Curated annotation (Swiss-Prot):
Disulfide bonds join C61-C72. The keyword Signal applies. It is found in: Secreted. Belongs to the secapin family. This is Secapin. Expressed by the venom gland. Residues 33-52 form a propeptide. Keywords: Disulfide bond, Secreted, Signal.
Length: 77
């Protein structure tokens, strides 16, 4: 008879744990769905603007040299 009560206690513990986990997970999912259902104007304020990409322009080298590996190198004829 003891074995049945042990199994019942284990089953109740597992069910209680899963119920608490569902209570914690479901509200966050509902919040995400309700956030998606907002109009785009309301959500655009939450978005972080993307940084503009800076084009890396190599510096101008003096005549007779070329820009090689991030520095100006003199080309010997």
């Amino acid at each position: 008879m003891k074995n049945y009560s042990k199994n019942a206690t284990y089953l109740i513990t597992v069910l209680l744990f899963s119920f608490v986990a569902m209570l914690l997970i479901i509200p966050s999912k509902c919040e995400a769905v309700s956030n998606d259902m907002q109009p785009l104007e309301a959500r655009s304020a939450d978005l972080v603007p993307e940084p503009r990409y800076i084009i890396d322009v190599p510096p101008r080298c003096p005549p007779g040299s070329k820009f090689i590996k991030n520095r100006c190198r003199v080309i010997v004829p």
